[in-house]
Amino acid sequence: MNHCNDQIYCIEPFKKQIQNLRKNNCYKDIDQLLIRFLRDKDIDHFRTGTLLNKSITHPYIKHDIGGRSGYRMYYLAIIAAKCIYLAYIHPKTGSDGSPNTTNEARTEFYKTIAKAIKDRTLYQVTVMGELLDFSTMI
């Protein structure tokens, strides 16, 4: 099985959102849920969720993780290259919770991903102990 572990990237808004959520005790499970969702998965796993564009080779996905009181995550999967680009995440409940993002916000996340890929201004996402680590992509 080809795993995506070494090809998971994110943009600045995703990184900042994780850092902000970690500060709130309500969301202390954020790293564990994301690690469980991301770790040791085949690229086809990342096709699941709500397709926000019509692309089979470059699906832009909205995916709920952690159940009813969990999180909603947006990401782009580039199937042939086996790369995942995490765009944004937000809790569905709690003090920072919201039911959904607007279509305009989702479009902006997508544009930000495309620009970051082109400009190579992404962070590589890895697991360090029990936390996600964001290192600048070279």
Spans of model-derived segments:
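Enriched for short, Lys/Arg-rich terminal
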Residues: 73-138
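Detector for short helical micro-motifs
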Residues: 34-37, 43, 80
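Sequence-level motif detector for i,i+2 pairs with an aromatic at +2
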Residues: 3-6, 58, 82
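A short, surface-exposed loop/turn module that caps and links secondary-structure elements
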Residues: 39-67
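N-terminal "first-domain core" detector
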Residues: 1-36
